[in-house]
Amino acid sequence: MGTSRKGNKQYGRDITDEGNVLKVAVDGRLVAAVAPNLLEDVMDNLTAGKNVLFDLGRMVHIDSSGLGVLVRILQKTKEGGGKVILAALQPGPKIVFDITKVSRVFEIVPEVGDAKF
């Protein structure tokens, strides 16, 4: 178990290993300039059978690169027998998920506490 924090003024993330769940809190803007960093950080902590919970309550913007990273993490997690849940998706980013139809491939719950693995 452990927590790591990285970020700058426009983007930040906390990753906490909670046993069978990797909790990833994203702050700010998940865009092309930082999306590869998130992918690398999550992949470094992802093991077979581990679930991933994204707390997106403080994410204010996402672009196609950010969406692509989330989809890659979803694919890798499923390959390992785990599950990905997105929680607390805010209205602005939710529009991007809905327009691109990416919301159809993720389980999205209103709050972090609603996630069931």
Predicted regions and their residues:
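Short acidic-hydrophobic, aromatic-tinged amphipathic segments that line or gate anion-handling sites
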Residues: 107-111
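Short alpha-helical segment
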Residues: 114-115
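Amphipathic alpha-helical interaction surfaces in cytosolic regulatory modules
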Residues: 30-106
